[in-house]
Each structure stands twice: as structure tokens, then as C-alpha cells.
Amino acid sequence: MAAKCPTLKPNYVVNLPSIKVKTITDKELINALINVESANNDNAYRSCEGAAGALQILCTMVRDVNRILRRQKSNQRYTYEDRWDRQKSIEMFNIYCNHYNLVTPEEKARCWNGGPRGLQKLSTKRYWEKVKKQLATQN
């Protein structure tokens, strides 16, 4: 006896999320990250973490970026004070993302927030949702 295929009710509705395709530039992503991280405040400081500047950079991030630069045989280095400088913070962000081969805005945002294994962390999914909301308000 052949199994019966289930039949769909005539008014069966499938709810699909709306699909919106938009290219996000690095500048747009960085602006969104700055708004999420510090509300666009270059002087922001979160004392419980030691996160400083527009991109809320930790001392460990500065050390990681300097380690990357040493491996690349670059003479360039960043100091903890450079976290307060927006342009230098953006440079550190770009060095970090390039080193870890982060390509998509989601990869960049989640790993910026959660480290090189950020894509594996649930907390960075919530962070990415905040960044996406910020990106939507920018456009």
C-alpha cells in the first residue's frame, strides 16, 4: 500500500521573511559599529571592560593587532592611547578583519565583538542584530 502524500489546505499560507538585498560598504559598516559601540563618541570609556574610543577597543585587541603587524614584518605599531583616535581605531579594525579573512559585514561585526571565534558565539548574533538595525536607520 502506497503512503499517501499529505495534502495542503487550499488557504495554506507560508510566511517568508522579506528579502532585501543591499550592498553594505565598509564605511557604512564602520559607522554602524561606531554608533552601536559608543553612540559616535570618541571619548567613550567602559571601565568594567577597559574598552575605549569610538570602536570600544580593548587592550587585548591592540596587542593582537600589533602581533599581526609583527607577523607581517611591518614596523607600524599601535599604542593603547591610539584607541582614542578614530582614524587609528578604524585602521586597527581593518588590519584585524583582513588578517582573519573576514569578508561579510556579519563576519566583521561578530568577530569584532566576539574575537576570532565570534561567529560561534550566540552573544554575537544579538550584537549583529543591533548592527543591522543601525545600518537600517543609516539608509
Language-model segments: which ranges?
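N-terminal secretory targeting signals
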Residues: 1-28, 136-139
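Extracellular/periplasmic catalytic domains that process cell-envelope and extracellular macromolecules
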Residues: 22-26, 48, 103-105
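Short, functionally critical alpha-helical segments immediately adjacent to catalytic or ligand/cofactor-binding
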Residues: 24-41, 57, 93, 108-116
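Secreted/periplasmic proteins that engage bacterial cell-wall peptidoglycan
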Residues: 32-75
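Extracytoplasmic/secreted cell-surface and envelope-processing proteins
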Residues: 42-43, 119-122
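Alpha-helical segment that forms one wall of the substrate-binding/catalytic cleft
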Residues: 59-120, 128-138
